[in-house]
């Protein structure tokens, strides 16, 4: 490798400084988006839990054995809903959840189960379509401004219809989820068949239904399924901003380290250049004296 001149080193340092400004700006933006996304996460969780609790209450009143959404079947065909990000520059955020999905797919295929994918987020869609996986539907640009509930509803409807029609025997939902305010990890859940823990009748109080209990129960179950996909997208969105904030913070710190290292190299090169010039001047003076 050719030795760099002080001018080249200075140009390199300036390039690193420019990169540092970009990564620092991205960190600040991600931190601001993270605060809003976390507010949505912690607002959505109680609603989701109450919906699940309500389904459990109602399950004590209706015969779930006759509801096809509760039908547990032998796995021959499986659908996987995978939520990833639309963008990169978020560390291992996308690769970890994609690896989790691949492990599940491999496990099922080794047992002779056919796996179909519904992919929410550009990164997952690009990854699995390029590798020839069986992709039923893919969505991108779903996290551009806010989490799109219509996409969540459509995804839930697709897998619900496939389950009811017998095209799939089980549906899994995979996404990154915030574990604490400062950590996240991939989660795998069974989306269908639906499982609800029946609540004791004593806890229920009295319900008066304007429609049949079965109709109301079906409505609440469908609402819950829609919201589960939405919540997975909300959790993933918050985790993405957190991952990007950390990645950009690390990139900024690495840039600072590089600037310090190259500054030392620059100072050394400049000192060597000055020393060389002084030696040349001294030699020239001595040569003149010799004449």
Swiss-Prot record:
The entry's cellular-component GO terms read: plasma membrane; proton-transporting ATP synthase complex
Report if keyword Ion transport is assigned. Answer: yes
GO MF terms here are: ATP binding; proton-transporting ATP synthase activity, rotational mechanism
**SUPFAM superfamilies (UniProt xref):** ATP synthase (F1-ATPase), gamma subunit (SSF52943)
Q: Which family does it belong to?
A: Belongs to the ATPase gamma chain family.
- How would you summarize the oligomeric state and partners of this protein? F-type ATPases have 2 components, CF(1) - the catalytic core - and CF(0) - the membrane proton channel. CF(1) has five subunits: alpha(3), beta(3), gamma(1), delta(1), epsilon(1). CF(0) has three main subunits: a, b and c.
Report what the protein is called: ATP synthase gamma chain
């Amino acid at each position: 490798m050719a030795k760099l001149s002080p001018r080249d080193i200075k140009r390199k340092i300036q390039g690193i400084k420019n990169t540092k400004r970009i990564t620092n700006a991205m960190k600040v933006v991600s931190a601001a988006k993270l605060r809003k996304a976390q507010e949505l996460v912690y607002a959505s969780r109680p609603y989701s839990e109450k919906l699940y609790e309500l389904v459990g209450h109602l399950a004590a009143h209706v015969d779930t054995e006759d509801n096809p959404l509760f039908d547990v079947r032998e796995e021959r065909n499986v659908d996987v809903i995978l939520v990833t990000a639309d963008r990169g520059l978020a560390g291992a955020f996308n690769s970890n959840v994609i690896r989790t999905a691949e492990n599940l797919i491999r496990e099922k295929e080794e047992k002779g189960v056919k796996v179909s994918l519904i992919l929410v987020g550009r990164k997952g869609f690009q990854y699995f379509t390029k590798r020839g996986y069986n992709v039923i539907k893919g969505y991108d640009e779903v996290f551009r401004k806010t989490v799109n509930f219509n996409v969540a509803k459509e995804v839930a409807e697709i897998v619900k219809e496939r389950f009811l029609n017998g095209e799939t025997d089980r549906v899994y939902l995979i996404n990154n989820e915030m574990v604490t305010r400062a950590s996240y990890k991939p989660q795998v859940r069974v989306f269908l068949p639906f499982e609800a823990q029946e609540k004791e009748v004593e806890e229920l109080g009295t319900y008066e239904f304007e429609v049949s209990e079965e109709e109301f129960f079906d409505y609440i179950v469908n609402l819950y399924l829609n919201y589960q996909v939405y919540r997975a997208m909300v959790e993933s969105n918050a985790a993405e901003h957190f991952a990007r904030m950390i990645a950009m913070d690390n990139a900024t710190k690495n840039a600072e380290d590089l600037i310090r290292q190259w500054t030392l190299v620059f100072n050394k090169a400049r000192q060597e250049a000055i020393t060389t010039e002084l030696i040349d001047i001294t030699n020239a003076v001595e040569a003149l004296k010799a004449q």
